[in-house]
Regions:
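Metal-dependent phosphoester-hydrolase catalytic domains
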Residues: 1-2, 7-144
């Protein structure tokens, strides 16, 4: 399974924590005042409790990001606008069946600065989101 797109979520967000760790506390700070609880409960069934009584939402997909922490230094932005520059787009895959072979590097920030590009879209980039690409390969089930 591959999940990819504009998540409007930075790598350190609750959304990414939930997707990559397969669970998140129902009391996570990013959920306060928002109506995620009802949606996640409908989508997920029920919460699980841990030994401290804290409740968690969980999913059974074992996902991994193609652009892992060690590559995030290379990928500075997937969204480059006048007032926000950061990573909002992601490619995730099931870690049991797929492996990341390679990823495309990010934009040349020095080139953007040198050419006085303060945001996208512009004549060089038609969207505020910049492309990301990953090459994946199937993991042979006999070698797992």
């Amino acid at each position: 399974m591959v999940v990819m797109g504009d998540f409007n979520s930075t790598p350190d967000s609750a959304v990414m924590e939930f997707l990559l760790k397969s669970q998140i506390s129902t009391e996570h700070g990013e959920f306060h005042g928002l109506k995620y609880h009802g949606f996640l409960k409908k989508a997920n069934g029920e919460c699980l409790g841990n030994k401290n009584g804290t409740k968690f939402f969980k999913h059974n997909f074992r996902l991994k990001a193609c652009y892992t922490d060690d590559l995030l230094d290379e990928l500075k932005y997937t969204n480059y606008t006048y007032d926000f520059k950061g990573i909002l787009d992601h490619i995730l895959h099931c870690k049991d069946t797929l492996r990341t072979v390679g990823v495309m590097g990010g934009i040349d920030v020095d080139w953007m600065i040198k050419n006085k590009i303060i945001g996208c879209p512009n004549v060089h980039y038609p969207s505020d989101h910049l492309p990301i690409i990953s090459e994946l390969e199937l993991i042979n089930p006999n070698t797992r």
